[in-house]
Every structure is written in structure tokens, then in C-alpha cells.
Design a protein with these regions (language model features):
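C-terminal regulatory/oligomerization modules of transcriptional regulators
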Residues: 1-4, 11, 23-37, 42, ...
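Short basic coil micro-motifs at the edges of alpha-helical modules that engage polyanionic partners
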Residues: 9-10, 68
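Helix N-cap at the start of a conserved alpha-helix in ABC-type nucleotide-binding domains
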Residues: 14-15
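Pre-recognition alpha-helix immediately N-terminal to the DNA-recognition helix
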Residues: 18-20
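Short, hydrophobic-biased segments on the C-terminal half of alpha helices
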Residues: 49-50
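Short, Lys/Arg-rich nucleic-acid/phosphate-binding segment
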Residues: 62-68
Length: 111
């Protein structure tokens, strides 16, 4: 049976997971330290961390008895590619608009 993959947008749709990602931009945290930032149980935070890990947004490193979470750049590739697609789309549209407006401005000056 194939392992289901997680859609990056579904993963970051949850505000708690986005907050975890933002916290991890500052430093690596162990799971207990992350849980202290939320008004939910440690198992609930662990579930969010598991989802982020499965989706590739974070790595988990075991140091002694502690598990530390760190951001993983690879998890953001799908998001970046999607955003870049629309960035290119809008850049192209705005460039075409600029060319059209410049042509109209030149034509109006000739009159």
C-alpha cells in the first residue's frame, strides 16, 4: 500500500503549524519547549510536529533523550515553486501592460 503524501498547502493551513514554523526560524527547539508556546497538550503539539516532519518542513534530531526540531528547506520547495509560477505570471502581465501604455503614450504625443 502506498504511503499518502501530504500537500504542503494543507500542512501550512493550520495556524498552529505555521506558528511552529515561525518559532523554528529563531532556533532549534525540543518538543517540550515548543509545547510551552501553545495552549494545547503536548501530544497535540507532537501530532503537529509529526505532520510537519512527514511533509518535510522540519527535521528531528535526537540528542540524548531529547528530540530537537529544526527547519528543513526542502519542505518549502513546493510552496516556493507555486508562488514563483504566479510571480512570473504577474511579472509578464505587468510588463505587457507597461509596453501597451508606453505605446499609447507615444501615440498621444504624436497627435
Amino acid at each position: 500500500m502506498a504511503t499518502p503524501t501530504l500537500d504542503a498547502f494543507q500542512v501550512i493551513a493550520d495556524p498552529s503549524r505555521r506558528q511552529i514554523l515561525q518559532l523554528l526560524t529563531k532556533d532549534s527547539y525540543n518538543i517540550n519547549s515548543l509545547a510551552e508556546n501553545f495552549e494545547m497538550s503536548r501530544p497535540a503539539v507532537s501530532k503537529h510536529i509529526s505532520i510537519l516532519h512527514t511533509a518535510g518542513f522540519i527535521t528531528i534530531n535526537e540528542i540524548g533523550r531529547e528530540r530537537y526540531c529544526t527547519l528543513n528547506k526542502n519542505g518549502f520547495i513546493e510552496l516556493r515553486n507555486w508562488i514563483n509560477h504566479f510571480d512570473e505570471f504577474w511579472t509578464s502581465k505587468l510588463k505587457k501592460l507597461e509596453i501597451t501604455l508606453n505605446k499609447k503614450t507615444k501615440n498621444n504625443k504624436r497627435i
